Structures are given as structure tokens and as C-alpha cells.
């Protein structure tokens, strides 16, 4: 048994409404493509995001910034007909075995991630734009990171397909001219999209360590 006593951030994801997809095989391929994009962008992952069983995916990060960045990038990288829900759990973890799906892990980080994704699903019944929740300890005290996630998810949930693609492109370092060529629109139109929410999202990503705080 290999116990990791360092503080980690475990991420569990689940495709939203996957049974409504015309082709589950195509949906799974779109998910894998999105995860490849995210893993290239957030290359510091201790365990890159990867599909596990059914419609779930998992990953492990050393700090909260990268964990939360990865979750929003998955949403931006998926086709506009797909979305993903996430639970982020903080704590230690341990390797308890291995299977054809990879290492079998357990521990507080994973328990918290499971609680977090269940909470996100429950809260989305009255907060339909919510897609991400974090659990960092066993107390019931409110976590400022969840206040941030509520607003971030609501913003991204209101994006159309083009806004998601442009936002992803900005994170990847593309210029507005490049994005205009990609989308077949003017640079001015890209700038308008940027002012209509994308800029706020990018700024919030840059300030994640300050906004989210907590142990790293």
C-alpha cells in the first residue's frame, strides 16, 4: 500500500445527460478529445484527467488552481451539446491496488471528491448552471471557493458554442486575430465576445490562488 501524505486535490467528473446523446460512442470520443486538450494545457497534473468507468473521469492535482482550471477547461473543450459535472476533494490519498483502468486509489481526497460531486448534482436541481463543487474538510463551514465556483459556472453555462471556443483559445494563448480567423468573424466581434463574459472568466482564472485560498 502506497500512502501519499501530501495534500492533494482529487477530481471526479461525470458527463451530464450523456444518455441523451445520439451516439454514446461519439460522446466518449468527444470526451477523450477534450481531456487530451486539457491535459496538454494543464501539464502539471499528478494524474492527468482520464475516463474511468461509465461516464466518469478522474484526475489528481497538486494545487487548487490547477484542479479548478482543469474543470473549467473541460467544459470549454467539450462540444456545446455536452457538459460535465465535477467534484473536487482535498486531502491525502493512497494506492490500494491496480486494475485494467489503472491504479486503484482511496483516501480522504477521493472521499471528499465523491461527496463534492454528489453535492454538485443535488444543488444543480435548483441551481441549474452549477457544475463544480469542492469539499476540503469535514466541517460544515462555507468554503469561499464554492462561492467562486457558483458564479464561474453560471457564467460559463450561459456561454454559447462560439464563446466557449473563444474562451478556450484565449487560455491557450491565441490572439484575437487568430481567433477571428478561426471563427470566421471580425476581430471586433471577438472583442465584443470577450467583453461579454470571457474577459471576466479569464481574469478569474488568473486570480484563482487569491480567490480560492486555503491549503495548497
Residue locations for each model-derived region?
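Regulatory and interdomain segments flanking nucleotide-handling catalytic cores
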Residues: 1-216
Amino acid at each position: 500500500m502506497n500512502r501519499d501524505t501530501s495534500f492533494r486535490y482529487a477530481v471526479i467528473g461525470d458527463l451530464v445527460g450523456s444518455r441523451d446523446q445520439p451516439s454514446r460512442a461519439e460522446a466518449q470520443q468527444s470526451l477523450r478529445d477534450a481531456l487530451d486538450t486539457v491535459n496538454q494545457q494543464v501539464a502539471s497534473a499528478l494524474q492527468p484527467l482520464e475516463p474511468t468507468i461509465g461516464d466518469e473521469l478522474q484526475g489528481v492535482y497538486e494545487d487548487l488552481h490547477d484542479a479548478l482550471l482543469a474543470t473549467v477547461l473541460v467544459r470549454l473543450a467539450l462540444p456545446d451539446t455536452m457538459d460535465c459535472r465535477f467534484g473536487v476533494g482535498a486531502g491525502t490519498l493512497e494506492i490500494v491496488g491496480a486494475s485494467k483502468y489503472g491504479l486503484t486509489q482511496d483516501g480522504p481526497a477521493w472521499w471528499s471528491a465523491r461527496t463534492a460531486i454528489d453535492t454538485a448534482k443535488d444543488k444543480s436541481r435548483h441551481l441549474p448552471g452549477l457544475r463544480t463543487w469542492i469539499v476540503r474538510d469535514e466541517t460544515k463551514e462555507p468554503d469561499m471557493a464554492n462561492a467562486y465556483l457558483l458564479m464561474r459556472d453560471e457564467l460559463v453555462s450561459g456561454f454559447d458554442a462560439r464563446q466557449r471556443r473563444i474562451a478556450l483559445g484565449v487560455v491557450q494563448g491565441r490572439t484575437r486575430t487568430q481567433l477571428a480567423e478561426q471563427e470566421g468573424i471580425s476581430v471586433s466581434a471577438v472583442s465584443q465576445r470577450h467583453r461579454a463574459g470571457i474577459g471576466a472568466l479569464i481574469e478569474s482564472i488568473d486570480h484563482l490562488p487569491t480567490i480560492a485560498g486555503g491549503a495548497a
